[in-house]
Every structure is written in C-alpha cells, then in structure tokens.
Amino acid sequence: MIYDGIIVGAGHAGVEAALAMAKMKLNTLLITGDLTKVATLPCNPSIGGPAKGIVVREIDALGGQMAKSADLSQIQMKMLNPSKGPAVRALRAQIDKLKYPKVMLDVLQNTPNLTLLQGFVDTLIVEDNTVKGVNLEDGSQVFAQTVIITTGTYLGSQILIGHEKTSSGPNGERTTRGISNQLKNLGFEMLRLKTGTPPRIARDSIDYSKTVPQPGDGVFQTFSHDSPITDLGHQEFSYLIHTSPDTKDIIFNNLDASAMYGGVVEGVGPRYCPSIEDKFVRFKDKDRHQIFIEPESMDLNEMYIQGLSTSMPKHIQEQMVRSLPGMENARIVRYAYAIEYDAINPRQLYQSLETKVIHNLFCAGQINGTSGYEEAAGQGLMAGINAGLKVQGKKPLVLKRDEAYIGVLIDDLITKGTSEPYRLLTSRAEHRLLLRNDNADIRLRDYGYQIGLVDDATYERFEHKKIALKEMIERAKSTKINPTEENLNYLASVNSSPIYEGVTVFKLLERPELKIETLKHFLPSDYNHEIYEQLEIYIKYDGYIEKARREADKLLRYESRFIPNDINYHSIHNISAEAKEKLSKIKPETLGQATRILGVGPTDVSMLLVYLEAKNA
C-alpha cells in the first residue's frame, strides 16, 4: 500500500506531524526505533517558558496535542512574568518525564488513520528529485506520497564527556547515519550542532535546608484551552541555589579537560543555553551563577540540575556538584554530557517546511537547526498540516509573523538560517503584543477548524467564548459606577482613589492599580477566569493593541505579495550585487520575506516591487 504520509521519528515534532495528518483523515505511518520512548524529554523536565509557553498554546489552538499532554503530566505550573505586561507572560510547567511519553503513546495508539511501526529507517527512496518512501534497515520498503523527517538529535550524533567521544544518541540510544549521508549526497547543506545536558542527582542525597524552595503558583491554570484536567493535583517544589567560589575554581582549573574547551567538540552550541564552563568563561566578572534543582518525575529519585550543563569528565563533574550548596554529599545518578549532531540548512526549506531540494519531503524539529521541545512540536504540527494539504491538492498554511510565534520561528529559520541551535525568544517577535498567551485561540482556532484538526464541539465552545467576551466588553462600556458609599469603600479597600461622578467600568479599569478582582466585583457573572483576563487586557491595552495591529497591517501588503519561484534576480536593474546573490540563493516566497534577508536593503526591495508590478502589468 502507499501511505499518504510517513513520519520518520517520534519525538515532539514527529508525534504532532503524525497526529495532524491522521486527523486530516489521511493514511499515516509513524516509524520510530522504540515505541515506549515516544515524545521523551531527554534534557530538561519542563515544557513552556518565555515565548515557548505561548507556542504550546498555539499548538493547542490549531488542534495539536502537546498542551493537553503537558497538562496531564505537569507536577508544577507557573505563570512567568505575571506582574509585567501581557506580551511577556507565559506558562511554564515541570513535567513528569515518565508520564508524558505514556500519555502521548496512548493518544497515538487511539488515533484513527494512524499506524505505528517500530523500526529503523536506513535511507529515503528518491526518484526524479521526489521522495517516494523509505528503506528500512530490515530490507523492507514503505511507500508514501509525502515523507516528514523528524529525527531530532539522532542524525550522526556523538556523545561527548571530557575527551571521550561515543557514537550514540541521547541517553545512550542508537544514532543513525544513513539518512544524514544521503541528505548530503542529495545536495543538502549540512550543519554540525551541539547541545548538552546537566547531571541528574539522587533526590535523597540533597540537603534542602541550604536551598530556596520555588513553589508553583498554586492557582489553576493550563496550557490547553480545553484542558482534560480540572485541578492541578499534587505540586512539586523546585529549589534555587548558586554556584560557590569553589565551583568557579574547579572549572577554570580544568578547562582543558572539557570537551568544549579541549578541542573535541566540532558542533556549534546554543547561545541561550550555555554550558557552565561557557558561563564562567564568557562572564568572567560574575562570581556565581543561578542553579535550579528540578524534579524529573514523581516516581524517580532524580533531580535535574538546571544551569549545570557540562561536558567535563566524570571525576570533575563529581567535584563540581559537591562544590554546590546542599550538594556536599550528593550522588550523581546520571552524568552530564554534550551531544553533537547533524542538521540541514533551514534556508533550503519553503515556508511550508517542504524542502527545496527534494519534492514532497518535509523536515521538522532539531534537524532544521532549532533547540527545544516546543519549537520542535510547533514545526512538526505545521509540517504535518502542510504535507496533508499537499496530498489533498490544497495550498499550504503559512502563519505570518503577526499571527503566531510559530510563524516567527519558521520565517526566521527559512529567511535568516542559523549557525547555532535556534531558540525562540520573545524579543524575536516584533508583533509580540498581538501574540499573547491569552489570545492564541482567537488568533488560530479558525485555521485548526478549517483544516480538520479541531472538532465541532471544541469549535462551538470557542464560538461561545467569543460571544461571552463581546458581551462582557459591552457590559463594561455600559455599566456605570456611581460614587455611593459602598463603591467608595470598595475603591478605598483596593487602594484606589475615590470617584466624584458616575464612571463606566471600562473607564474605571483603565486605572493601573485595578485588576481582575475589580471586574468580578462590578461585573459578576458565571464566566470563567479566562474571560475576565481577556477583558482586563482588552480594557488596559486596547489602544496599544490597536496601534500594533495598524503597524502589522502596513506590512501586510508586502507579506501578501508573492514572488515567482523562477524569477531571475540578476536580470533586475538597480538591485545591489549582494542582494541579487542573497535573493537568488534563498528564493523568498513573498516580498515581506525578502525584506528580512540580511544584505537586502530598502532600495533593493523597492526595485523588486517595481519589477514585479511591471511584469504583472
């Protein structure tokens, strides 16, 4: 039989891609080396964080799975930056790393149109620059209309501890070389990247009296807009400590022993998740660095030491760990390591995540040069959607930079490329006030429903929410608060100045000191906290949001101006030589994308626009 889509690898990108295609009623095959290890968390036991938490919400709005699985597996939930503006708020959860893969496997096994196969892919079947399927290591072949590669850090991977180098994937699992070599031979530009993970410490060997406990928020909040949970359950603590002067001395005295500084590492590491060696070398003026001790699972006697990623030899790791407060007698359960792996140059991808080199071949996740579970899952979802749309003969779904962080991520990758593991940051999004944690469903739910990933019941609840929000906005504008004794006493109780004449709730809530509680006091209803949160943001930031929307709309004419793929840039007059070279290499799909290419200036864009208009005249 010929499948509609084959997904190679069942990490965070692979499972989202497979579920998306299957939900689109397409015959889908997901191949992975070990079905008990789908969507594992080989590094940090957490999901979410700045920008990343919003990506998880976006995945959920589009009909993906990560948010629901995270809610079911969380052991601590926290809203980051709650006192700051809504543009930078984001959820972060500690995840039970044993439970999360089980939850995801259960979803995969119960999804219609999805077949799971435990096995190893050796190479792709490619004919006439078009992928036709895959060759398995056992000699069998499987054919499909599309193939999505989501191999994570397993392509040509090597584990590095000190000067020891082992051919292996994360946690001693198998690496794969066949696909990596084949991609190179097919004309893909390969990158060599590096990431790392810290040691894991026995939970019962830590003296917690020397740490600062870090609890969750203690309030019910979820990643999913339609969460399968109704309470958070037992919440674990994380713990904060700092490195000691001894830690710094141990590192500087042994830098040559590190894989990173001993010349063993070839790959480029992540700028925003440096090793502890990197932190001390790059920031010599800092005497200490934060370390967070985080639980890995309710059922594991292991704690994750965030901030202590290293490639030092094991005996140096022992010294480093025992130099930390509360870790004087700590036992290392698993040692830290660095891992090198192959990735492709993401500028060889279209915005749909289909490759420019081989037709019907899509790539998603760390193979595209990103870091992080959330970035991988977002790409996997989009690759699955667009592979499905291609099978259905429809246009790809391309999320714009003012629509989603996922859109920012993909646009950055395919336009600017990367020479190091790419991490999504709030600062990368110029329209971040539009891309908030609270409004992911408003931005993206319609797309998920139209494609077939969001069911009727879920969409109906979303429609009711929009109606409720509209009703509450009208109530806030029409409900007048008069200076009665009761109202004046209430305002005094929340440290707000008195009113001297009637004022609407909408106008009153423009006061910075008044929050959601005031809305609930003056506009009581049966609606949930989410409605009140969005109402508060609408009232307080309406002017700013409208301004951001107008600025985004100005750029829309460039984003919607498509550029033919066969255009000869060298024939266009008055464009700089550098711009011609960059445009010819990257082949931007829209004028908007062309504006973001390094080396393409405003004059070049203007001349390109003149050329396109003359050609269409």
Curated annotation (Swiss-Prot):
Q: Which SUPFAM superfamilies does this UniProt record tie to the protein?
A: FAD/NAD(P)-binding domain (SSF51905)
Superkingdom of the source species: Bacteria
Is tRNA processing one of the keywords UniProt gives this record? yes
Binding-site positions, NAD(+): 269-283
Report what the protein is called.
tRNA uridine 5-carboxymethylaminomethyl modification enzyme MnmG
Q: Which SMART domains match?
A: GIDA_assoc_3 (SM01228)
Assembly notes: Homodimer. Heterotetramer of two MnmE and two MnmG subunits.
Q: What biological function has been recorded for the protein in this entry? A: NAD-binding protein involved in the addition of a carboxymethylaminomethyl (cmnm) group at the wobble position (U34) of certain tRNAs, forming tRNA-cmnm(5)s(2)U34.
Molecular function GO terms recorded: flavin adenine dinucleotide binding
| Cross-referenced Pfam families | GIDA, GIDA_C_1st, SAM_GIDA_C
Q: Name one GO cellular component term.
A: cytosol
Show the disulfide pairing.
Answer: none
Q: Which UniProt keywords apply?
A: Cytoplasm, FAD, Flavoprotein, NAD, tRNA processing
* Cofactors named for this entry: FAD
Concerning InterPro entries, the annotation shows: FAD/NAD-bd_sf (IPR036188), GIDA_C_N (IPR049312), MnmG (IPR004416), MnmG-rel (IPR002218), MnmG-rel_CS (IPR020595), MnmG_C (IPR026904), MnmG_C_subdom (IPR047001), MnmG_C_subdom_sf (IPR044920)
Example GO BP: tRNA wobble uridine modification
Binding of FAD occurs at 9-14, 121, 176, 366
**Which HAMAP family does the UniProt record give?**
MnmG_GidA
Record field: transmembrane:
none
Q: Please state which protein family the record places this protein in.
A: Belongs to the MnmG family.
Q: Where in the cell is it found?
A: Cytoplasm
